[in-house]
């Protein structure tokens, strides 16, 4: 059997990276890691608190160190934070060390999925969260596209269907009869 390759999920908040990532890892018998959860675990603080204390720049520096470390592991499905692609280094780590899957979603669907979530520091104090999401999409979507090996829209599919599509696409990419 071939050596397992890493799978990295990128995309905006609310695209389904964590939900799909957990199920994908389970189906492929790989470890699931959420980079934001690792940051919270290591700092003992949630992302919102880190943003409040250190600002976005401080958080992004932490995130870059964690993504560098995690992408060097083998056989993982990694869900990244929505802004991880802002760092050129992160984009390089992700694209060089595994298969990058961009889970694409519309701003409208993002808004629906995130409007009651209080753990979204960039939306917490926003007067117009939908406008914030639109502004983020303009900056980040081209960066997701730049590094994506596979792009999948998540608006109309449930997680199980998405996982099966991803497995099929990876199998086709590898030509290894299901071995990653």
From Swiss-Prot:
GO terms for biological process: amino acid biosynthetic process; aromatic amino acid family biosynthetic process; chorismate biosynthetic process. ATP binds at residues 14-19, 120, 157. It comes from Haemophilus influenzae (strain 86-028NP). The lineage of its organism: Bacteria, Pseudomonadati, Pseudomonadota, Gammaproteobacteria, Pasteurellales. This is Shikimate kinase. Monomer. GO terms for cellular component: cytosol. Catalyzes the specific phosphorylation of the 3-hydroxyl group of shikimic acid using ATP as a cosubstrate. Substrate binds at residues 36, 60, 82, 140. Its main location: cytoplasm. Its EC number is 2.7.1.71. Pathway: Metabolic intermediate biosynthesis; chorismate biosynthesis; chorismate from D-erythrose 4-phosphate and phosphoenolpyruvate: step 5/7. It is an enzyme of class 2 (transferase).
């Amino acid at each position: 059997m071939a050596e397992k390759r890493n799978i990295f999920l990128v995309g905006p908040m609310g695209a389904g990276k964590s939900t799909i990532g957990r199920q994908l890892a389970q189906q492929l018998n790989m470890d699931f890691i959420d980079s934001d959860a690792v940051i919270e675990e290591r700092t003992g603080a949630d992302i919102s608190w880190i943003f409040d204390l250190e600002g976005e720049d401080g958080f992004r520096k932490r995130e870059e160190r964690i993504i560098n470390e995690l992408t060097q592991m083998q056989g993982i499905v990694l869900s990244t934070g929505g802004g991880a692609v802002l760092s050129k280094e992160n984009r390089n780590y992700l694209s060089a060390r595994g298969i990058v899957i961009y889970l694409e979603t519309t701003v409208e669907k993002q808004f629906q999925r995130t409007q009651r979530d209080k753990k979204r520091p960039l939306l917490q104090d926003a007067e117009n969260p939908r406008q914030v999401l639109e502004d983020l999409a303009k900056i980040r979507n081209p960066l997701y596209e730049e590094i994506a090996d596979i792009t999948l829209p998540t608006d109309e599919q449930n997680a199980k269907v998405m996982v099966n599509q991803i497995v099929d696409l990876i199998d086709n990419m590898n030509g290894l009869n299901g071995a990653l």
